[in-house]
A protein has these predicted regions:
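Carboxylate-rich, polar loop motifs that coordinate divalent cations or form catalytic acidic clusters
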Residues: 1-253
Length: 253
């Protein structure tokens, strides 16, 4: 879900993109032969950039919707082998410099600079410990300080170092319990600057102490496969998972 600057609510589904104007829905779907239509009907991510363009991440690539023209266009990503019939886009974000970061599951991360049109591809290199930790990238988080966090489906999370144009791994292990966040499906930052990592459980990463704590739900209220997390007010997290919708009060733990 996304609410844009004009008030429209956009809803990505497995059967197209819906726009709600508070009274009516309008549905956008792929139309064979129409290059100005949405290129794929399975939506995984939505993002509005600082210029008001809507970015749509789908099961097979990225598309942009120009509101003024009411047209979709394909955003071409380089370096992705043609044999990859599916280019799943789980996350699209804009950093403080106006550059667009795109997570492509299986291919790593792409950074697009609108000012010159250049695209840089970041991928895992087994011989380079400062490369992206995995190509199975899922979510991207840009926190209030501008730090860029990249979550992966098998190697946990890493941060981008803009000074060296490289990445370093975050130790997301609760050392007391021995649990490690490795299969990250969702990320968010709370009002206190903590980073929340979600896989089959919930982990809090303290940026100041660099400690990671596993926050376990009650045994009778299990939370499995968390796909979404956000802070709806200071100290209150809303978590979407296969178990339903859960509200987590940080003060009461």
């Amino acid at each position: 879900l996304l609410q844009d600057r004009t008030g429209y609510i956009w809803c990505g589904t497995s059967d197209g993109l819906n726009r709600f104007d508070s009274r009516h829905f309008k549905t956008f779907r792929h139309i064979p032969g129409d290059t100005a239509s949405l290129g794929n009907n399975v939506i995984h991510s939505l993002f509005e950039d600082s210029k008001g363009n809507l970015w749509i991440g789908t099961e097979n690539g990225v598309f942009r919707y120009r509101v003024s023209e009411e047209k979709f266009s394909t955003f071409h990503l380089p370096d992705i082998p043609d044999r990859l019939s599916q280019k799943i886009i789980y996350s699209i974000k804009e950093d403080q410099l106006g550059k667009i970061w795109i997570s492509v599951y299986g291919s790593g991360v792409f950074r697009y600079n609108p000012s010159d049109g250049k695209i840089k591809h970041y991928s895992h290199d087994i011989n380079d410990e400062k490369s992206l930790i995995s190509n199975l990238t899922t979510k991207i988080l840009i926190d209030h300080t501008g730090d860029i966090w990249i979550a992966t489906h098998d190697q946990g999370v890493c941060k981008y170092d803009p000074f060296t144009d490289s990445f370093f791994r975050i130790d997301a292990t609760d050392k007391q319990r021995g649990y490690t966040a490795r299969y990250i499906y969702a990320l968010c930052e709370d009002s206190f600057g903590n980073i929340w990592l979600c896989d089959n459980g919930l982990f809090k990463y303290d940026k100041t102490t660099r400690n990671c704590t596993a926050c376990l739900p009650p045994a009778d209220e299990p939370i499995t496969y968390i796909h979404f997390i956000t802070e709806i007010q200071p100290g209150i997290l809303l978590i979407g998972s296969n178990s339903g919708l859960t509200q987590y009060n940080l003060a009461e733990n």
